[in-house]
Structure formats: C-alpha cells, structure tokens
C-alpha cells in the first residue's frame, strides 16, 4: 500500500493564506515547481519564491474578474492524468503532470454571515474553479495529493522528507477524503443558503418562507467512537459541528476520567445548558437528562450543597455543572459526599484537579466561559424524518410577567418564581418545579398528567424533609384543570408561575384566589420532550 508518488509540481490557490508562504517555501526548497493564481501567486512572488502564474502556464489569461482562472485542459489534464496510462496523450498535448494541488475555497460562509450581505456578494463568493480542482485531484488520488487544510502542511513536509520527496497512497487517500468532505460541506452551505430563499423568489409570504431551506444538508465531524450507545446493544459515535461559537459539551476539554459515554454526553449537555440560564454562582445536578437539584448562591460550594439536598438519592451517579470555576473546596465536597459521573465547569483550579484525580473514574470537563447564547437549530429524529426547530432560547424577564390573581406576589415569591421557571424549562414535560430561596425543593418530571408531576414534586420535598410552605411552583405549560393548583395549595405553595392559555384559565385563576395563591402568567411555554 506504500505506492509512493514524488511531488515535483504543485498548484497553490488559496483564499485562507495562513501558513501558505511557509509551506510554499518548504516545497520550493525540496525542488517542487510552484504554479499559482491571482493573489496567492502575488503573495508568493513578493516573498521571493519562484512561482509561475497559471495564466502564463496555460497561455490563457484570467478573465471575467477572476471567474475563469484554472478551468483549462492543461490544468485539469495535469491533475486528472493517470500516470502510466495517459502519459502519451498528455505529451501529445503538452500537458505536464501536477502532483499536488493546494486549495481552499472562497469564504462563502463568512460572507453570507456578514450583516447586509447582498445576493450579489453571496454569488461572487461561490467558488467554481477551486472545487473543480479539489474534486479532480481527489478523484485521481492514486497519483495526486490534494491539500485543503493548512493543518496538514507540516505533516506533508515531514512525510516528504521521510520518503525522498514522495507521499504514500495512504496519505493521499486520507487527504482525498478530507477534500471530498470539504467540498460536500461547501456545497451544503450554498444549497442551504439558496434553498431558504426559494419561497421569496416564488412570491410566497415571509411567514411561509421562514428560515428553513427546502432541503437540509448537515455536516458534522466525528469526534469520538463510543463503546456503545444509549444501550449496550447499540453502536454509537459523537459528531460535532465545525466552528461552534458557544461553550458546549461538544467543544469541552476533558481533563481526567474515562471516555465519555453516550448517556454522559446527553446528560452533560442538559446540565450545562441549564446552568447557563443563571448569572449568579449556580449548580445543576442532572440524572437521566432531568435536573434533580438546582441552586444559586454566593458561592458554587453553597450552591452545590443546596442543589444536592434537593434529592441526594437521585444525585448519586449524576452529572454536576457549574457556571463558575471549579475550586478545591467544592471539588472536595463532591468527592467526599457522592459518586459522580461528570463534573463540567468553565474552568478548574489546579488544586481542584488534584482532588478529583483521587477518583480516576470521575470525568472532569472544562468548557470555557460563555458570554452570550448563540441562536441555532434543534433536531429530533423520527422514523423516516427529522424535526427541525429554533433552539429554545426564550426566557421572560420580571417586567414581562402578568399577575392574574387577586394577590400580588411578594418580592421573595417573585424571585423564587423566576428561579423555578428557569429550571422548569429544562425538565421533561410535564414539568413541575417547587423552589424556595433560590433552591429547588421538589421536581416532578415526565409525567403524562400535570397533576401527578405536582404530586411527585411534593412527595420528593417531603422525603427530603424540605419545607414546602411558602414556596413557588413553576409549570412548563398551562394547567388544563384546577386540580394542579389544589394539589399545590395542599402542600403549602403560595405562588405559581405558568404560561397560561388554557380554555379553563378562569377556573384555574379562581382556584388560586380561593387558596390565596399569587399566580403569574409568562405567556411563554417550555415543553421539553
């Protein structure tokens, strides 16, 4: 499988010029003839490198403002020509073999992401010659090396040095795979961009057009293979988006512990996204994708202590997320108190890592700090299809709330209501959250009946000896009947926050008034399935 091919002639044409001068210098120093186009050629010439413009090489000028540069038989014949099979026809037409193509494409994604980008701007940043050369070289990888990533430059030079100026078939094949991935992702971006414009071109309303293209092309990069999936009989892998712009489990760095499992990643994502909702030092403990304890306080140590007290039984083997650096004192409290699968935080102190290292199986991840939440898409696979929606980044503020009961909430009740409303957003529907003094005291998750979620939240609080009287209750969706309010009143809830919107809202509000409960409408639902 060695099948080495010497690199004697290379064509370089890049939009992202990072590292290209050094790479070209290294190639030239090893006797490689350099061909290039436009700005790349000028850059290399300015650095004193012996470079031949493609227009001089082909005898055909660049034209149409650079739209036509490399689309010429002398270029593509040199790339596609099969060594040992097409040599005669190449010689007949004066076509020299090109052994390496170094290309990256016009910055289409960056262009369309710019505010005020016009259709004309987008069109002019659709690369034609680049993808054509990339695909030609990748197709003929038995003889030609195609380089689309600057991160490969050093490894290529090292291999050439180790193989007397040649590259192996294994390397050329690997580079070809990267090339096809590169062009597939590029074409997908273009298809998605123009696909989302189709309704507007057909004169349909903006509402009908929405933001979704008529075909959806997704590109993810495999980060790791896994021992198994959600269950041991399922195979699995973890794929991530390229250029993720927000701190996430996908971009987190694992500092210690065993490899993350499928369920670890899903639960860590749930914990991290929940803790992001809070500005104060916060701790979220998750089990099976549901928060089982959440608290905010003046320190993450106290926040952890209070979150743990919500449900110590469920916290065993859970995932713990913080929105502040993991410090030694908090790490010690966790390790001394419970078995934990994963701890994730923006950062971790050296002292904290020394403590967690005593438990080798504990996975510690750092994800960096987050300043803003980035809008994007959520996906849910169904048999034969894919549901797509915007990420649920919605969250009401105190000024947007509507008090619909006779009694107004106290300042403390209002704070508790907003706190448990943030938590309810991340609890599986039907979701009920009891909270008091910035701490969950009972969580009812995933029940088919909302009233049973309310009952479970009360049972959990009672089992842990937590005082419900005077607490706030959040419901992720409206109460269809008054029974949920009656159940809340029976355990001492004094404030309820919910979306509203039921045909029986009047009946539900009347129940709150009967019990002296302050009721707040958010006019925003947070179903989570």
Swiss-Prot record:
Question: Part of which pathway?
Answer: Purine metabolism; IMP biosynthesis via de novo pathway; 5-formamido-1-(5-phospho-D-ribosyl)imidazole-4-carboxamide from 5-amino-1-(5-phospho-D-ribosyl)imidazole-4-carboxamide (10-formyl THF route): step 1/1; Purine metabolism; IMP biosynthesis via de novo pathway; IMP from 5-formamido-1-(5-phospho-D-ribosyl)imidazole-4-carboxamide: step 1/1
> SUPFAM superfamilies recorded for this chain?
Cytidine deaminase-like, Methylglyoxal synthase-like
Domain of life of the source: Bacteria
What is catalyzed by this enzyme? (6R)-10-formyltetrahydrofolate + 5-amino-1-(5-phospho-beta-D-ribosyl)imidazole-4-carboxamide = 5-formamido-1-(5-phospho-D-ribosyl)imidazole-4-carboxamide + (6S)-5,6,7,8-tetrahydrofolate; IMP + H2O = 5-formamido-1-(5-phospho-D-ribosyl)imidazole-4-carboxamide
Instruction: Quote the NCBIfam families the UniProt record gives.
Output: PRK00881.1, purH
UniProt remark on domains: The IMP cyclohydrolase activity resides in the N-terminal region.
What Gene Ontology terms for biological process does this UniProt record contain?
'de novo' IMP biosynthetic process
Q: Name one Pfam family in it.
A: AICARFT_IMPCHas
**Gene assigned in the entry:** purH
Q: Which HAMAP family match?
A: PurH
Tell me what this protein is called. Answer: Bifunctional purine biosynthesis protein PurH
């Amino acid at each position: 499988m060695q099948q080495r091919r010497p690199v004697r002639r290379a064509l370089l044409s890049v939009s992202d010029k990072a590292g290209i001068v050094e790479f070209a210098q290294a190639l030239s120093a090893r006797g490689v003839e350099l061909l290039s186009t436009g700005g790349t050629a000028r850059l290399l010439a300015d650095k004193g490198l012996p470079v031949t413009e493609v227009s001089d090489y082909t005898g055909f000028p660049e034209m149409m403002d650079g739209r036509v540069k490399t689309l010429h038989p002398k270029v593509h014949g040199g790339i596609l020509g099969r060594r040992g099979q097409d040599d005669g026809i190449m010689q007949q037409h004066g076509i020299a073999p090109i052994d390496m193509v170094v290309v990256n494409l016009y910055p289409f994604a960056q262009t369309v992401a710019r505010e005020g980008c016009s259709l004309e701007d987008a069109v002019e940043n659709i690369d034609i010659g680049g993808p054509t050369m990339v695909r030609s070289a990748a197709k003929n990888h038995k003889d030609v090396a195609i380089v689309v990533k600057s991160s490969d430059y050093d490894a290529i030079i090292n291999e050439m040095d180790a193989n007397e100026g040649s590259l192996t078939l294994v390397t050329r094949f690997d580079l070809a795979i990267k090339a096809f991935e590169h062009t597939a992702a590029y074409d997908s971006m273009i298809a998605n961009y123009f696909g989302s414009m189709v309704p507007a071109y057909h004169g349909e309303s903006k509402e009908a057009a929405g933001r979704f293209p008529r075909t959806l092309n997704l590109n993810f990069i495999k980060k790791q293979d896994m021992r198994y999936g959600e269950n041991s009989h399922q195979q699995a892998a973890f794929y991530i988006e390229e250029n993720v712009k927000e701190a996430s489990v996908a971009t987190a760095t694992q500092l210690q512990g065993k490899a993350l499992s499928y369920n670890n990643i899903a639960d860590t994502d749930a914990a991290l996204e929940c803790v992001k909702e809070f500005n104060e030092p916060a701790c979220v403990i998750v089990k099976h994708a549901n928060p089982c304890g959440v608290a905010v306080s003046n320190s993450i140590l106290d926040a952890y202590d209070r979150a743990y007290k919500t449900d110590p039984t469920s916290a065993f083997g859970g995932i713990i997320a913080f929105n502040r650096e993991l410090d030694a004192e908090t790490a010690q409290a966790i390790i001394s108190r419970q078995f934990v699968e994963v701890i994730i935080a923006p950062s971790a102190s050296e002292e904290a890592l020394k403590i967690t290292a005593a438990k080798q199986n504990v996975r510690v991840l750092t994800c960096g700090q987050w300043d803003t939440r980035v809008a994007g898409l959520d996906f849910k696979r169904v048999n034969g299809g894919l549901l797509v929606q915007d990420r649920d980044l919605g969250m009401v503020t105190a000024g947007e709330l509507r008090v619909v009961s006779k009694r107004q909430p106290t300042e403390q009740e209002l704070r508790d209501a907003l706190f448990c409303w943030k938590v309810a957003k991340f609890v599986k529907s039907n979701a009920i959250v009891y909270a008091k003094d910035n701490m969950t005291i009972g969580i009812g998750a995933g029940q088919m009946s909302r009233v049973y979620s309310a009952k479970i939240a009360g049972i959990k609080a009672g089992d842990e000896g937590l005082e419900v009287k005077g607490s706030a209750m959040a419901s992720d969706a409206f109460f269809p009947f008054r029974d949920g309010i009656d159940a809340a009143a029976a355990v001492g809830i004094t404030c309820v926050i919910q979306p509203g919107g039921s045909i029986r809202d009047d009946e539900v509000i009347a129940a709150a008034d009967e019990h002296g409960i302050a009721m707040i409408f958010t006019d925003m639902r947070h179903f989570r399935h």
